[in-house]
Amino acid sequence: MQQWVDCEFTGRDFRDEDLSRLHTERAMFSECDFSGVNLAESQHRGSAFRNCTFERTTLWHSTFAQCSMLGSVFVACRLRPLTLDDVDFTLAVLGGNDLRGLNLTGCRLRETSLVDTDLRKCVLRGADLSGARTTGARLDDADLRGATVDPVLWRTASLVGARVDVDQAVAFAAAHGLCLAGG
């Protein structure tokens, strides 16, 4: 098992490396390429993966806690199961990935591309989806209670069976042009 603590990598090409069971703490990765990398069963705490590329990367059974994925791109990755605790995906591209059933509670997904992403049965309680691009996203049976969302999500994502707060239900109605009136 490798441990990388307080280290920094810029523009590093990790393509096709086996980094399974890697442990990072306070590591900084900027513009690195993790395409084809095996990061299965890895653990990351307080690490940042900024503007990195993850294509066909295996991340299953991994844990990310207090990490930043700012501006990183994920394409055709194996992401389930995955443990996420206070992860910042601001400006990341997760479009087209299978995130079914993941717990994204409290994660920041501001201005994240979730186009055609499968988020069915995800827990997004308290998540920040402000400005997220959600065209074709599948949020069926997801738990969105307490999440911050823009009106565009209510119009562009599939939400059959999603759990929402009353305020969110009112926002959904307004986004669809419904007029709510009492009795």
Curated annotation (Swiss-Prot):
Residue ranges occupied by any Pentapeptide repeat domain in the UniProt entry: 113-147
Purpose: Might be involved in fluoroquinolone resistance. Also inhibits fluoroquinolone-promoted dsDNA cleavage. Increases fluoroquinolone (ciprofloxacin or moxifloxacin) inhibition of gyrase supercoiling activity in a concentration-dependent manner. Inhibits DNA relaxation and supercoiling by E.coli gyrase.
Family under the similarity heading: Belongs to the pentapeptide repeat protein family.
SUPFAM superfamilies, per database record: Pentapeptide repeat-like (SSF141571)
Subunit-level organization: Homodimer. Probably interacts with DNA gyrase.
PANTHER family: BTB_POZ DOMAIN-CONTAINING PROTEIN KCTD9
InterPro entries, A to Z: 5peptide_repeat (IPR001646), Pentapeptide-BTB/POZ_domain (IPR051082)
Protein name: Pentapeptide repeat protein MfpA
One Pfam family it belongs to: Pentapeptide_3
Domain notes: Each subunit forms a right-handed beta-helix with 8 complete coils that stack upon each other.
